[in-house]
């Protein structure tokens, strides 16, 4: 599955990696997949997607998928961002 996803699906034409990453994060937020959000929020940051863009995506998703998943995702994003800031400072 991982080989297929990252070797095939993520390489298909039509979307840039940053777009795929943001879409994936939105799906994970909408479906409440907190564990996977950690990995993909890290990946999004590594691709240069800003915290502000991810926060805006979470707010947008909240209007369609509900505020409880958005609040949870906001917490997860803060945890990931803070951890990455600490990693880069050391």
For each feature predicted by the language model, list its residue ranges.
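Extended intrinsically disordered, low-complexity coil regions enriched in Ser, Thr, Gly, Ala
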Residues: 33-55, 70-81
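Short secondary-structure capping/turn micro-motifs that flank functional sites
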Residues: 60-61, 78
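Short alpha-helix boundary/capping elements
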Residues: 5, 27-34, 65-66
